[in-house]
Amino acid sequence: AEGLKGSLSLLLALVVLLPLIALHRRVNWAPLTQPVLLLLPIIGFTLVIYVIRDEPLLAHYGWLIFPAAWAAWYGALRYLEKQPGYPLGALHVASALLLTVSIGWQLSQPLSAGIWAISAWGLTFALALVAIQRLKHLGWPFQRHAATMNTLLPRILVGLLALWMVISNLQAPGSSGAIPYLPLLNPLDLTNLAAIWLIFRWLHRHDPTLITDRQLAYGLPGALAFLWINAALLRAFHFTLDIPFRFEPMLASFAVQSGLSILWSVIGLVTMLLATRRGWRPLWLVGGALMAVVVLKLFTVDMSGTGTIARIIAFLTVGGLLLVVGYFAPVPPRAPEDPEDSDRSTIADNSEALHDKH
């Protein structure tokens, strides 16, 4: 009943507000267009009602009313382009975000609670970001409001996508539905992979000015990838060995701790090999720090109760990887000092020496 009331309220708003634009065409009185701005918050309020009722937007004639409301709203925005004094750029960003959330809610509703519903939200944010990349050359509204539609809106979507990655990988995955869970080949892991690629691509190709620091621009996608691969391993243990997806059971599991040690060692090895090949000393130090954490973990956690085969395998594997690192991945040399900085430091040293003599 509440969902039906929300749909009817939205329909009533359309019936009341849209004639104001038609009337404004005749009398050209500016205040007539101002109430039309209420249509967007009414759409948002109706969405909240559906969310509270846990109902899809297509219910209660929503399949007809919501498309009509969005068409009317964007038609009103197009008409308001001719009227001065309206924050149209901000309105377009708010509209796009609300439309994205509406689509995400609708996509997640038919799916049972679990990795499919969680993946639907990530897929929605990812597709919205891709759509902006493809549509940014359109005259309206993207080129007309380029500062907000082509810069601010994608940045918000990148942030939402990163936030979705954190939430989806920290919470319990729920059920995998009727389809058996396949590690790395399930919708949640595949959506995470797509999200990492999109965030990396956006930071380095489409919006390189968002993060000017090179290490941070590589570090953010790298941190998200590290979070995802660890969560993917824990989900694999959760579904295959029936280990509860909680901190205490995972910490107490011999298989989980050995798997994490091997995974971190492989990541550290790959990171250090890549850093040696590219000459990236900071990246090598990150890999070295991860290997040090693995060694510390082996002696404080993994080997605390000796005798299990999983722990012995983990210890031997990590030891072998450390040997590979020592041979194939030596630490890269420091970056050469900037000649101008060297000259300035030399001049400063000479001036200090002359000052000491006097």
List where the protein language model places each region.
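Alpha-helical transmembrane segments of multi-pass membrane proteins
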Residues: 1-358
